């Protein structure tokens, strides 16, 4: 809160030590949600795949490669031009692009009568002709399918919602359409697009041409599993020039992968021999990572002159490619590419620190004075916790909502203590379990290995009491709050967020906040 500058200047001159010790008085007690670990600056999470893509793009450009967008839609004939006789087998793994045909819709008198019945009025003169022109224009592709409803509503002079009903009941052929495939495919690897690109630029740019692209590819896998997706990202590059050899691939691989911590490299012939590469040039790249050891990370080769000639390209071209998901799995030590790519579709994994942020108070005082009173109640209760009862200790006196209020911590029953054995328990999260534990040797491992939530039963109960005391003070009344046995989080004023509860139950973790608290806090209006 703001403080009086002049007052502290004077106090500094006359009593420096006193002014120094008075410093904490200018701090406004925070709400429980403003106390760490619930209060923290959260960093937004970048997706590991897109993070890897960003790093790959930066690495390529730092090596002097220009970025390109490579065609996604590949005509079937291009696959034959690149793979030759092998193309028939290769096409088994690609997706063909298909779509719904546009029907030739006839308008009979029966249909016109059905439309008139739906719109509850006779069709105006010229409406039949307008409707026929509209459907004919749709058939000819003069407007898109998502505009059909609007165009028909204009022709018929009715609302779009009525047209939807007409299409559903009067023109059933729209619902009976079956998709038809074209001869266009989605690229299954970046090479398909590189050949098309090289055909247009190889003799129009200075040599050597160095370009890269990081983008999606599509492969018709029989099923997706821990290491295969039907769509994935490929980080691919080409180097085209008269003197290009396989040594180019080795140099590019080292320059690119060293940016990810790989320190040593091995190159060995790939057992798979793609027909678009020259014989003996298809090479697997293995990199040694300080954490993960030797892993396969890329493949390169020199495009076959037989394939390049189909596109009129007359210089050798080195192509290197790697799966982004594969590299990201190595870097993050992920075991399942599905969970790495589509994490939101799988149960989340939370650290103990993550879980602490979802544990807070159900009720707490709304005023700064109320929060100061919480601290006073805690100090008084802790100082006299073992005092035998009956006993009563004044904890705080001050103003709440225009009334002078006095608060005491007491235990009216005989032959017990001011606080119960669990009143000083502190809440920890350890290996996903939420536990309220005392400061004893028995629970030393919980405190050593767990993450403190920053809430004790004493703190949560004192906040509950002050919240109720404030409510009573608003109407000029005193009140008494008593907490006995804790069996559930709410018994000690604790709120566990739904995502934390779901994580605990889904993973069969423990939630144990039980214990004898036995604490009574009473207020009265002076």
UniProtKB/Swiss-Prot annotation:
Stored Pfam families: SepRS_C (PF18006), tRNA-synt_2d (PF01409)
Database matches in Gene3D superfamilies: 6.20.250.20, Bira Bifunctional Protein, Domain 2
GO biological process: translation; tRNA aminoacylation
Keywords: Aminoacyl-tRNA synthetase, ATP-binding, Ligase, Nucleotide-binding, Protein biosynthesis
EC number: 6.1.1.27
Domain of life assignment: Archaea
HAMAP family: Sep_tRNA_synth (MF_01674)
Family: Belongs to the class-II aminoacyl-tRNA synthetase family. O-phosphoseryl-tRNA(Cys) synthetase subfamily.
Physiological role: Catalyzes the attachment of O-phosphoserine (Sep) to tRNA(Cys).
UniProt-recorded name of the protein: O-phosphoserine--tRNA(Cys) ligase
Organism name: Methanocorpusculum labreanum (strain ATCC 43576 / DSM 4855 / Z)
Gene: sepS
